[in-house]
A protein has these predicted regions:
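RNase H-like nuclease fold core
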Residues: 5-66, 70, 77-81
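RNase H catalytic domain
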Residues: 29, 33-37, 77-134
Length: 134
């Protein structure tokens, strides 16, 4: 059993998680999940230094890409609100990163009574991006 990974690896003393060397532990990681697409969607943020959940939202009817987008904006807004300037945000969603850079959620999700609340959250996120430096 000596080949089993140690959590955390002995060479990482800045995290409780098994992170590769190139990943900064002083960071938050965001991710979304969706059961079906569209379907029940939720997202969360984890502090890589402590492993603690920073926030969680959902489930709400949506898509995975929307959840990834909202998770990034939620993390950015929370960092701004708390005056956190020394952390990195990690996201594995290229689409969400592009949408954040363009300050617009480019979803094709149909706007219906079931998705209206989500569209209001998206509008709030887009407005936050337009009114804050990212």
């Amino acid at each position: 059993m000596s080949n089993m990974p140690v959590n955390p690896p002995s060479w990482r003393n800045d995290t409780v998680l098994p992170l590769p060397n190139e990943v900064k532990a002083n960071a938050w990681a965001v991710d979304a999940a969706c059961s079906g697409n569209p379907g029940p969607m939720e997202y969360q943020c984890i502090d890589l230094q402590t492993g603690a959940q920073v926030f969680h939202y959902g489930p709400i009817h949506g898509t995975n890409n929307i959840g990834e987008f909202l998770a990034i904006v939620h993390a950015l807004a929370l960092m701004a609100q708390k005056g956190i300037t020394d952390k990195v945000i990690y996201s594995d969603s290229v689409n969400a990163q592009l949408w954040v850079n363009k300050k617009q959620c480019k979803t094709k999700l149909e706007r219906t009574p079931q998705t209206e609340q989500l569209y209001q959250i998206i509008a709030r996120a887009e407005n936050w991006l337009r009114t804050h430096p990212v």
